Amino acid sequence: AASDVYKRQDMVHIGAVLRVTPIKDVKTMIRAFAYAKRDVPNLKLWIMGPTDEDEEYARECFDLVDLMELPDVVFTGRVNVTEYLGGLDFTILTSISEGQPLTILEGYAAKLPAIATDVGNCRGLLYGEDDDFGESGILTHIMNVKEIADAMVNLARHPVRRKQMGENGYRRVMAKYK
C-alpha cells in the first residue's frame, strides 16, 4: 500500500513510473540500483506500473531482483501514483526511447527531481529549453549502469541539492505545463 512508503523514514525512496517493458530498460535500472545500494544501503526502489504488457520481460525483471537479492526493489503493479509521490525522494527513468515523459512532469509537480536517460525531451525537461530555472535532475546515457548508479548515489547523498533540483522542476512544470 502507499502508506508503506512512509514506514521507513530512514530510507531514500526512488520512484519509477513505467510499463515494465524492454523499451523502459528496467533491467538496467535494477542493475544500477544494486550498484548504488553498495554505496548507499538505505535505498528503496518503487517500480510502479503494469507488468502484463510483456509478461516474459516482467518475469525476467522479477528473476533479476531475486538473483541479485534486492528486497528493496518493489513492483507495485498498477497503482494511483499520486498516492506514492509524497513519499518519494526522486524519480528515475531509464528508457531507451521516449517522447515527452509524463512521469518526469508528475514528479516535478510533487517537487521531485529526476534521473533520466538522454532520450526524447528528457534533456529539455531536466536542463530547461528556454528558461533559467536551473537543473532539475541528472541526465545519463542509455544502458549505462555505472552512470545511472552514480546519479542515484549523488541524489541520495545530497538532500539539499535534491530539494533545490525538485524546486527547479516544480517551477519549470508550473511555468510551462500548468
Residue positions per predicted region:
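Short hydrophobic beta-strand element within catalytic cores of glycosyltransferases
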Residues: 113-116, 123-126
